[in-house]
Amino acid sequence: MAGGIVAVPLLGFSLLAVALIIERAYFWSQIQLRQNRLVNDVLKLYRSNPPGAIAKLKQNADLPMARIFLEALCLEGATPTEFRLALESATQAELPLLKRFNTLFQTIITVSPLLGLLGTILGLMRSFSSMSLGSTTAANASGVTGGISEALVSTVMGLVVAIATLLFANVFRSLYLRQFALIQEQTGQIELVYRRFHDQPEEKEYATSR
């Protein structure tokens, strides 16, 4: 193999990175396409039809924001304080899912260049071991060039895997930060609606009876 023995783990890292990138890309695409529209619909619907809003959330329970809202809205007779605590605890429970695979991404980004460097050293060692003082035979020259080629290929492979993974990891991190800010905003909105709803029991009875 052109990159030497370190090409094997680097190839494994590249395949793993591709699989993780595809999973995260699908996850975030679903959130971007569906979640904001769902939250807006639920906020409007809850003012007039709370059971209908809860039913709509249950239909989209695969989305993090739907699970967060359900955790609080399904509490019977919750005070505004209890409602807020339920939102906060549900938000904390969803954060690991939003940050999923971050550790693996960082491992690939960190280890891949080191493996490339290791391949460089092994390739140079092979080149030096093939050199014989005063010898200019074809076999000797082939061993030297083969070792240098191994050193260069392993370095390039390590850098390519690390750089490509870093770019996607940064994109996913920016999506996570944006989503976290939206969660703070949207949980605040549903809490405000619930407080108004809780403070007007006659409106609540009317909406529930509809």
Curated annotation (Swiss-Prot):
Pfam families: MotA_ExbB. It comes from the Bacteria. GO terms for cellular component: plasma membrane. Coiled coil: none annotated. The keyword Signal does not apply. It is found in: Cell inner membrane. GO terms for biological process: protein import. Belongs to the ExbB/TolQ family. Involved in the TonB-dependent energy-dependent transport of various receptor-bound substrates. Protects ExbD from proteolytic degradation and functionally stabilizes TonB. This is Putative biopolymer transport protein ExbB-like 3. It comes from Synechocystis sp. (strain ATCC 27184 / PCC 6803 / Kazusa). The lineage of its organism: Bacteria, Bacillati, Cyanobacteriota, Cyanophyceae, Synechococcales.
